[in-house]
């Protein structure tokens, strides 16, 4: 279950899906593909407790959630994209797209390397282990799933958002 509130989605502009839009239960802007997953990360501090999740834009259902673990928001965004790609491959899903609001994470996925500066400590060991696994997955698998930029300024917060921001923009 995913909780959506007026801060999560830009509710000033859209309250419900338009009557013509029968491809989603979410109030998505017309230009957003509903046959998609949205990923996002949340982190309290930098570094700090980090978690990430994925939401199906057709149903609003949470596809996965991981964390919290000690890390950074950028690491969480990267791991969320790779987790979604791996799960799509595992389930044979080839017709969806992935939305992410993180330019850094999308670039890291494209380059198959997470360029984090997170210090290696016992507290951050799990995050570094997951990053290594994700990088290995990217190097050993090919994927054709489009990873699209979620336009937060235009569309409001991504539906996978954790809703913790107080007026900040990515």
Predicted stretch roles:
Residues 76-84:
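An active-site-proximal "capping" alpha-helix that borders the catalytic cofactor pocket
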Residues 168-170:
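Acidic, His- and aromatic-enriched active-site or binding-groove loops in soluble protein domains
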Residues 12-75, 87:
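RNase H-like nuclease fold core
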Residues 43-46, 86-163:
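RNase H catalytic domain
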Residues 61-65, 78-79, 90, 121-125:
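Glycine-rich loops and low-complexity Gly/Arg-rich segments
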